[in-house]
C-alpha cells in the first residue's frame, strides 16, 4: 500500500522566533489534492534529572499556548551555541534552568513530539550525579521558572490527578518507573 504524499507547492506563511509555518499543497496516494499545514521547530532536548535522594527535578512555569502553569522536566531547543549537538544542549539547559551539572548524562530516546503537525525532534536524557554548577550560564530572559523536587510515587499521583499533563514529562516519569521496576 502506498502512503507517501507528493508535494506540488509549498509556501512559508509565517517565520517567527520559535517556529516557521509552511503550507503545502499535496497529492495523496489516491490522487486527491489536499493541503498540509506544517510547523517547523528546531530540534530539542529534555532531561530527566534525578537527585542523589532519588527525586526528579521539575520546573513550574507559565505556558502561553495552553494558558496555564505547568510542571515539566527541564527542556529546551538546540541553538547556535550547540552546533547541532544535543548533548551539549542538554548540559547547557541543565545549567541554565536548574543550576546543576551531571556526572552522568545518558541518552534515553529520541522522538517526534507531535507528528500530525510538527517536525520537532526531541532527545530525552537521564541526568544523574547532580552537583551545583560553579559557572552559572545566563538564564533566558523570557523564562520564569520555579524548581520542585518530587518522588516517583508523587509523580505518578500527579499524573493521575491531572497535575502533570506535559507529554515529555509523562514519558520521563514512566521511564523512571520502568528503571525502578528493573532494579
Show where each model-derived region lies:
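Short loop segments at secondary-structure junctions
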Residues: 29-30, 51-53, 62, 82, ...
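Nudix hydrolase/Nudix homology domain
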Residues: 1-5, 69, 107, 122-123, ...
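Short, solvent-exposed loop/turn elements at beta->coil junctions and helix N-caps
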Residues: 11-12, 109-114
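Conserved hydrophobic/aromatic beta-strand scaffold that supports enzyme active sites
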Residues: 21-23, 48, 58, 124-126, ...
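Acidic, metal-coordinating catalytic segment for phosphate/diphosphate chemistry
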Residues: 9-46, 51-53
Amino acid at each position: 500500500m502506498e502512503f507517501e504524499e507528493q508535494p506540488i507547492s509549498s509556501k512559508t506563511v509565517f517565520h517567527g522566533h520559535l517556529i516557521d509555518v509552511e503550507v503545502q499543497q499535496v497529492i495523496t496516494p489516491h490522487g486527491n489534492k489536499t493541503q498540509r499545514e506544517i510547523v517547523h521547530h528546531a530540534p530539542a532536548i529534555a532531561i530527566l534529572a534525578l537527585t542523589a535522594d532519588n527525586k526528579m527535578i521539575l520546573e513550574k512555569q507559565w505556558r502561553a499556548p495552553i494558558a496555564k502553569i505547568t510542571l515539566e522536566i527541564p527542556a529546551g531547543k538546540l541553538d547556535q551555541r550547540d552546533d547541532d549537538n544535543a548533548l551539549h544542549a542538554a548540559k547547557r539547559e541543565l545549567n541554565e534552568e536548574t543550576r546543576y551539572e551531571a556526572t552522568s548524562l545518558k541518552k534515553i530516546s529520541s522522538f517526534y513530539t507531535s507528528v500530525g503537525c510538527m517536525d520537532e525532534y526531541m532527545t530525552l536524557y537521564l541526568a544523574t550525579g547532580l552537583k551545583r554548577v560553579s559557572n552559572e550560564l545566563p538564564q533566558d530572559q523570557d523564562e520564569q521558572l520555579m524548581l520542585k523536587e518530587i518522588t516517583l510515587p508523587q509523580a505518578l499521583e500527579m499524573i493521575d490527578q491531572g497535575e502533570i499533563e506535559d507529554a515529555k514529562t509523562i514519558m520521563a516519569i514512566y521511564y523512571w518507573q520502568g528503571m525502578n521496576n528493573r532494579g
